[in-house]
Amino acid sequence: SRDWSSDVCSSDLDRLLMVISWNLPQGHDLDRYFGYIVKAPLRQNNFFGLKRRKRLENEPKVPVISKLQEQTLWYKTKPEFFSGNKATWPGMLYTALIPCDSYYLLLGWNAKNKYSQFKCIEVLWYDSKQEPNFGKNVFKIPKKNPKRLVFEYSKEAQMSLRFDPGQNRIIYSHLGPVDENPAMTGQFAFYGPDGSFDALNEHDNRWILEEAIDVRNKRNKNDYAPKPNHTEEIQLYPRNK
């Protein structure tokens, strides 16, 4: 049997929000997900001891704790277009929190079943009543208008999904079927990374897809320094004449 996992996400850039999530195996290779969101007030010191800007309209004066109730099997039908709230939460285990203007991005993972799993870029935003909602159109993807991005792949594979704060973009493995047979398209139990990477770049508070990026480290001036000539003799001590 598998052990349960948990994670706590907060952002060093914002420090106004903390998300706690965990999963419990339920048998038959299915997991249940549980979570809380703790939203700190803006004007007072929050739980990180950081003072923020003037309070917004309807902004609570004390930290608000929202219990998340999973919408079971929410991913069965068009998961990228599902809209949720704290009572119909698209459950997953969150691993990173990215603050944006008027919303947050969450990087998450869901075990799904014994054949496939998925990672997700979720959108968390608050309405006028300061209630949390999940899913929003902040992505600019050709021929799509998703409320979140879902990457499903084989249970045997490993996918990279991370935020690069230096370049303010999300980098992730490009997935594809292990076999080029067209019949494998959409059979996600046979999907895995193909060795290339894509990225989402933030522009005007939206995230724009950039395909086939170069993930190699950029060279700096020290990389072009002349290399030592190892054929030359280095005399540490003068020879006796």
Named regions from a protein language model:
Residues 39-100:
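Short N-terminal edge-element motif at the start of the domain
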Residues 33-44, 120-130, 185-204:
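Beta-propeller blade signature
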Residues 211-241:
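Gram-negative outer-membrane assembly/targeting C-terminal domains
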Residues 16-23, 103-110, 168-174:
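Short beta-strand elements that form the blades of beta-propeller/WD-repeat-like
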Residues 91-128:
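Hydrophobic, aromatic-enriched interface-forming segments
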Residues 93-100, 112, 133-202, 211:
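Short aromatic loop motif centered on NTY/YTY
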